[in-house]
C-alpha cells in the first residue's frame, strides 16, 4: 500500500466520496441546500484530514469500512469551516471556483455551513458504534469545534491589530489544527 496522502486517497477515495454523499441522502434539503452539497461534492479539496483518519486506522489493522463515517465527518466539518471562513474573509473563490456565499448568497452559505456541522454531529451520534467511545468522540469533536471557532475569532481580531509570530502560531493551532 502507498501510505502517502495521494496513495491513501487513490485506494479509498471512492469509498470516502460515497460516505460523504451518504451523510446527506436521508436529509430532505430544499433545492438550494441540495445544490450546495452537490457543488461541494463535485469540487473536493485535498482531503488531507480524512486521508489521515483512513490511513491511520488501516495502518493499525482496522477495517476501512469501520472508520469511513468518521473520515466523512472530519471532511464535512472542515468544509463547513471553510464556508464560514470565506464569508468572514470575503473570499470570492475557493478551490478555483466561486465560494459558496459568492455563488448562492450569504444567508444560504451560513445555513449550509450550519447544516453541515449539525449533520456531522448527528452522524457521529447516530453511528452504530458502542455508546462510550461514540460519546468520547462526540465530546472531542465538540471541543475541537470550540477551539476552531476561537482560532477563527483570533484571526478576525488579529486582522485589525497585526500579529506576532506567537499569536499566529496559536491562531493556526486553533483554526486548522483543531480539526
Annotate the PLM regions.
Residues 1-24:
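N-terminal amphipathic/basic leader segments beginning at the initiator methionine
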Residues 24-179:
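Mg2+-dependent prenyl diphosphate-binding active-site environment of isoprenoid biosynthetic enzymes
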